[in-house]
């Protein structure tokens, strides 16, 4: 499906700035694919959108890891940061020098948590390992 939609388009073909989190499993570190919107971001422009999409979506147990050339094997971006909007805001303020004042930057964040993975109220906060055994998995997968 990604191939049909994006073909051979690359990050460099995008008209808007993007920052896409993933984990370079070969290097054991986070990696953020970026458009070349600052002089120091010259490495990722050549990557195909299909490869970047498969890399950032490679959630363990759901989708396979994805290899991009000789650069490495990549895993789900949510492993390095499940709120990419915060990375974008950080980038805007620290790299693009957007002022840190109300209204200077906007972030649209669409949550994915399921109701079953949420906790309300102050009772039962010290669950212990037996309760967390199931709850932790639900929390990590849905947040």
For the regions a protein language model found, what residue spans apply to each?
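Conserved catalytic cores and adjacent C-terminal regulatory segments
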Residues: 1-143
